Regions:
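WD40-repeat beta-propeller superdomains and closely related acidic/aromatic-rich repeat-like regions
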Residues: 1-345
Length: 345
């Protein structure tokens, strides 16, 4: 482990020893949890100056494949290649929520306001609600990603050939299908629920205007964008898959016929952006790069500021704390970095 760096904001570096699959803070922002490809979840203070050693919990006998904060604000959910969805409480005890009949659980999301959890296993999604557990699907292909609408009334699923939108309060009703050729690999609702965005295997983004069903395609990406983020106000859509921070504007009439805002990261050699994460309350986007660099893009000021340099391994997970002052970045090699951006004086 390493302590605070000599320059820049307070930071901490911890070696977890395995691919960082996902990161999540508890609702207070005091605790950070990191799930790894070794099937373990590490818990540590989000404050990089704390210095406490991580506390490990075994969640799966194989790998953790998906991770998020749970319903209580102090618990976390992990899906694994053992087909189990596991809840880890504040007491660091792991309990099984469900076991998929076949395959592994490689997608999980939670909506605290509706007390709902959705977990993807193959072509099926298991929707856990206060009224019981419902099996949604099968979908046209294995589920690549899923997300709740901001109010939790809908669950959107990405798969080959487009997306499927389920009504969470009426899971037995026929879902809405939005079709577009190719494999859709990431999916996010805009904060105002007006748009649904996906990234595709064909190195493009696709966006539907949900009221009318009209859609638009954004092409020209260097590779497939595995990470999508909307700014807190829904005015910008940002993704990985390119060397620039490409921001598509959705204020007013949207981006049709308009070029995106492109922000150039500093440095002489272009490096692919692998992960993005939007600030919870300001027009900032955290950028993780293929060489391990971490930057912050300020869309309002149209600039990108480096936070930390290369580690030699791609950034695989990014996370802001709920108040937006602390952040964390994990890499494929298992390096976890914590930062504190609070003003010092």
């Amino acid at each position: 482990m390493e302590g605070n760096g000599a320059k820049g904001p307070p930071r901490r570096r911890v070696e977890l020893g395995a691919f960082v699959v996902g990161l999540a803070h508890d609702a207070s922002g005091a605790t950070l949890a990191a799930a790894t490809g070794a099937g373990r979840v590490a818990f540590l203070p989000a404050d990089p100056m704390a210095g406490d050693a991580p506390r490990d919990v075994e969640a799966h006998r194989g790998a953790s494949l998906a991770f998020c904060r749970g319903l209580s604000g102090t618990d976390f959910l992990s899906g694994g290649d053992d087909g189990r969805l596991v809840r880890i409480g504040a007491d660091l005890q792991a309990t099984e929520v469900l076991k998929a009949r076949r395959g592994w659980i490689d997608g999980v999301v939670a909506h605290a306001g509706r007390s709902m959890i959705a977990a993807a296993a193959g072509k099926v999604v298991h929707l856990v609600t206060p009224a019981g557990t419902h099996e949604l699907g099968p979908h046209p292909s294995s589920v690549a990603d899923l997300c709740f609408s901001p109010d939790g009334s809908r669950l959107a699923v990405a798969h080959y050939g487009g997306t499927t939108i389920h009504l969470t309060q009426k899971p037995a009703e026929k879902p809405r299908s939005l079709s577009w050729k190719g494999s859709h690999i990431a999916i996010r609702y805009s904060p105002n629920s007006k748009f649904l965005a996906t990234s595709t295997q064909e190195n493009a983004l696709h966006v539907w205007r949900l009221a009318s069903g009209a859609d638009m395609q954004m092409q020209g990406y260097a590779t497939k964008a595995k990470s999508l983020a909307w700014t807190h106000d829904g005015n910008w859509l940002v993704s990985g898959g390119v060397e620039l921070c490409v921001c598509w504007g959705f204020a007013g009439k949207g981006p049709e016929g308009q070029p995106p805002l492109e922000l150039q990261p500093p440095g002489d050699e272009p490096v692919l952006i692998t992960r993005v994460a939007a600030h919870p309350a300001a027009p900032f986007v955290l950028l993780g790069f293929a060489d391990g660099q971490v930057h912050v893009a300020d869309i309002a000021k149209k600039r990108v500021t480096p936070l930390d340099g290369p580690t030699g391994s791609p950034v695989s997970a990014l996370e802001w704390s709920p108040d937006g002052w602390r952040l964390a970045a994990g890499t494929e090699a298992g390096t976890l970095r914590l930062f504190d951006l609070r003003p010092r004086g």
